[in-house]
Structure formats: structure tokens, C-alpha cells
Amino acid sequence: MDSRVSELFGGCCRPGGGPAVGGTLKARGAGSSSGCGGPKGKKKNGRNRGGKANNPPYLPPEAEDGNIEYKLKLVNPSQYRFEHLVTQMKWRLQEGRGEAVYQIGVEDNGLLVGLAEEEMRASLKTLHRMAEKVGADITVLREREVDYDSDMPRKITEVLVRKVPDNQQFLDLRVAVLGNVDSGKSTLLGVLTQGELDNGRGRARLNLFRHLHEIQSGRTSSISFEILGFNSKGEVVNYSDSRTAEEICESSSKMITFIDLAGHHKYLHTTIFGLTSYCPDCALLLVSANTGIAGTTREHLGLALALKVPFFIVVSKIDLCAKTTVERTVRQLERVLKQPGCHKVPMLVTSEDDAVTAAQQFAQSPNVTPIFTLSSVSGESLDLLKVFLNILPPLTNSKEQEELMQQLTEFQVDEIYTVPEVGTVVGGTLSSGICREGDQLVVGPTDDGCFLELRVCSIQRNRSACRVLRAGQAATLALGDFDRALLRKGMVMVSPEMNPTICSVFEAEIVLLFHATTFRRGFQVTVHVGNVRQTAVVEKIHAKDKLRTGEKAVVRFRFLKHPEYLKVGAKLLFREGVTKGIGHVTDVQAITAGEAQANMGF
């Protein structure tokens, strides 16, 4: 991570050099060469017919991998050809983990040729047959007319193909919701998930709060989860037409799980825990149009950058401001996104066509940052955000998912509950492997460094029963009569074959983002590594006596309370007051349970 990311934390790091990223990316449809990643500055001369002189627009050449397929036309294929097309569709769906995009009327090299109306109708009919064959559904995203070198109107059509994998109940995407206090995070989620607009006084957010003081103050202090479903046709499924979460899950082919995080600075540790432990696919950064970048906005942006979580931005409360105020806030965001240490390309979304393009480019390039402007009271532009979320594909590919599933089981314990007639229940994310009902696992480390045997009695995802949990999925696991007092946040449940190692001392390569004076041996910080959150003391700074803001070094930390389960390469974030730093674990000094007991005074 570039040390200049510290500027986004509100620190006083010396600014680095380097040019800012270019202008705001204008979201354009498939019919525009500049908006689709085609060659810039290279144009072929088109023929002049009927007074038209059009240049051939291009998409990037078709890639063998990925979930995007180009087809010039699909008119009356032979049976052999049809079977080949079906096999090809299965491959694209597998690459997109259940979603694929077909561009009809496009050559393999990306040239937008287009089809006449009859050919397009026949091609879509064939595509529908292919989808039926594999058990998928298709939705036409958009159509574009291209008239290059032709007197007859010709169109290209972009089609979304969606199929829930056989081993899953629905496609799942986790979105962390960030933003300053009072920016409207919980209100927006209430509007999306309840299906009713806000009254301007926070009515929509009431169902999301978990504590009385949250209802009284209107401010989130804990992590809550809300779900928004989409059926196979891309239609919203929420509590407006479903009474329970189970009904939403049953009716949805794609599920968006929103992780609502706290905006107030006093709850920053909770927000960091939500980002590091719940492994969101991406983040939604909410910015109030009337206040702009204020409070913790810049710090939350810096957290997303430091943890390499892709994010998009929603400018809320546009009903309270003049148009010029909204434009000023957008320009302010664009300047921050382009500055050194961020290097993002803003993409302002103002139409449904823009939303489709933004979803695709956001998935393909980590530098693209879509910006939406909307109101939770009037509902203006709310549909554009829904279109974006419906089309947004999983940001990890099938190969990465398959590799994780081949590893031994590892489940992060993030939440612990006691449920009547069920017993002890833990919530968290499966980092690797596969977990099934009845599996025998070990959980730890305990305060004395031990791992204890347990059995997974049942599994639930989004409040619906589930027999098998796969890597990357979040769920709750019932552990029966296992003693809750033996569990704590930060533990892991792993396969006994893993022979897990624990440590009290570890080393990490860090960048000190901000510190008021000098960072020295003996300084205490709160360390966040995945679902681990514990105070640690700096034992040694290699090759240096002290660190200043913006400097990098390898540092040895020691946990103060109890040993933890860490892995080399894990991302690390530490803070104490205004002191902040990021890095990754480079070495762990493994110890036995006996050594842990001796170190901790047992």
C-alpha cells in the first residue's frame, strides 16, 4: 500500500509526488468506443452512406477467461453447434460464479457489427433455448443501434444470464456500508430492504436498529445485517412483498447482504472489525450531499483503500440541497479520488445505461469508482443503484473460489449467541474449505492456548437452513450444548487435521500512516488482523530505533492478553488514538499450549 494513503486518514503525512489520475470517466454504453476500453486515438474511416460518416466502435477483444461472451449471431444453429454453445454457456457461468453477460452482434475482436431485427430476434430465441438447457434465466440489459457501413438499422444486445449453482441456494454478495455519522446509511438500507421511502425524519431506519439507545439517538453503534434479494428476472425482492427473511431467500436468485457499520468516531473500532472480519466483497461509501466529505468520511475511505476493499460512492440527501451543492460535493469527491495515494477513476452514474456500464467496469477494474446521487425521501435515482447491485458480479473468480474450497476447513468466529432450545450459536465467515452438518472441528485458541473439540449441529445462512457451507460464505453454526463461556470473538474453528499453530509474538511489515511524535519500542496499539482484535506492544523495530509518519519498517509485536491464531501474509491494521498504521504479517513465532500458559502466567 502506498504510504500516501495516509492523507485519507486525516494524518499529516508528507505528501508524495506523482500525477493525479485523469478526468472523470464518463459512463457510456456498449455503442461507444471511448467508454468500453477500446483503443484510444485509433479510428478507422467508415464509408459515407446517406450522409453518415461513422467510425466502428469497439469493445476490448473477447477474453478466454471471465464471464463475458461475444456472439455475432446465433441463427438456426445445427444440433452439434447448439450443444457446443450450451457447453460454452456453462463455462461462462462457472467463470462468473452463476452470472454471465452475452454481447449479441459483436465479433470476437470486439467490433460492434450489429444485427438486423429478424436476426436479433432469432439469436435471442436461440440464447433463450441455451439458457433453458442449463437451467438459467436471461434478462436483456440494454440494446444499442449501430449504423456503421449500413443503410439498414442494426442493433447489438447485451444480455445477462443468471443461474444459481447447483450447490448453492442463491448467489451471494456482501457489501459493507461506510460513511460519516448522520450521512443516511441506515436510512438508505431501510428504504432498499423495506421497500418504502423515508419520511425525512428517519422512519425507514427504525427496523434496523438493535439497541434502545440507537433508536433514541438515531445513530448505529453495532454491526447489523440487512438483505436485499433479486429474482431471476432482476426484480427486487424485499420485505415489501415478503414477510420473513426465509421468504426473501426462497424467492431470490441473488442476495445482497449489507453490513451496516457505525459512522461515529467513538465506534471506529467496531467499523474496523466489520471490515476486517466479515470479508465484504465491496463497500458502499455514503456521503451526505449537504455536508460533503466531513467527519469520518475520509478515514473510512482510507480504511477501504488500506484493506484493498473495492468501493463505490453514494451521495445521499440530494432532496435537501440545490443542484449546485450536489455538484460541488461530487467535484470534491472526484478530487479526493484522483489524488496521490488513491488513484481512482470516478464514474458518475446518471442513467440506467450508466449503471450497467458502471457495474461491469467496477468488476473488471479496481480503479473505477462509480458515484451515485440519490434521495431516500423522494426516491430519485434509487432505481439506478438497484440496477447496479443486480448486475454487479462476484468480484472473486471461480478459480480462486475452487482453490479455497480445496483447503482444510477454517471458520472465523465473529459473533457468539445463546438461542433457546438450540444452544450455543456462533456467527462468522468460512475462510477456506467446506463445512457440513455433523462435522467434527476444533475451536481455539483459548486463553491458555488450547483447542477444544466440538461438533457442528446445524448451519443457517440468512436465517435459512443450509447443509453445506463453502469457502467465502458467511453463516451461523449451532454447536449444541458447547459451553459459551469457552468461546470469544477472534477464535477460529478448524479441521483437526490442520494442526493449528498459535502465537503471542509476530512480526509485520508496516507503514506508519500517522503518529504525532515518534513510534518507538514499548508503544501499545490495538491490532486488527482478520477477526482478531487485541492490544499488542511493540517489542522491536528492525534496523531502526524509531519511526515517523510515512516511514516503513518490520516491527515485532507481542499480544498482551492471550495467544492468537495468525497466518503469514494476513493484512494488518493497528491504531491507538490518532496513531494509525497498516501492513501485513511476515512471521509468526509458533508456541505450544504449555508455552502459552507459561507466558500468560497460568
UniProtKB/Swiss-Prot annotation:
Disulfide bonds: none annotated. GO terms for biological process: nuclear-transcribed mRNA catabolic process, no-go decay; rescue of stalled ribosome; translational elongation. Pfam families: GTP_EFTU (PF00009). Residues 16-64 are annotated as: Disordered. One of its GO terms (molecular function) is GTP binding. GO terms for cellular component: extracellular region; platelet alpha granule lumen. The keyword Secreted does not apply. Keywords: Disease variant, GTP-binding, Intellectual disability, Nucleotide-binding. Changing K125R: In JABELS; uncertain significance. Residues 170-398 form the tr-type G domain. GTP binds at residues 179-186, 260-264, 316-319. InterPro entries: EF-Tu_GTPase (IPR050055), GTPBP1-like (IPR035531), P-loop_NTPase (IPR027417), T_Tr_GTP-bd_dom (IPR000795), Transl_B-barrel_sf (IPR009000), Transl_elong_EF1A/Init_IF2_C (IPR009001). Residues 40-50 have a biased composition (Basic residues). CDD domains: GTPBP1_like, GTPBP_II, GTPBP_III. Predominantly expressed in thymus, spleen, and testis. Expressed at lower levels in brain, lung, kidney, and ovary. Induction: Up-regulated by IFNG/IFN-gamma in human monocytic cell line THP-1. It is linked to Jaberi-Elahi syndrome: An autosomal recessive disorder characterized by developmental delay and intellectual disability. Additional variable features include ataxic gait and abnormal movements, visual impairment, microcephaly, abnormal foot or hand posturing, kyphoscoliosis, dysmorphic facial features or seizures. Brain imaging typically shows cerebellar atrophy and hypoplasia of the corpus callosum. Belongs to the TRAFAC class translation factor GTPase superfamily. Classic translation factor GTPase family. GTPBP1 subfamily. PANTHER family: ELONGATION FACTOR TU-RELATED, GTP-BINDING PROTEIN 2. This is GTP-binding protein 2. It comes from Homo sapiens. The gene is GTPBP2.
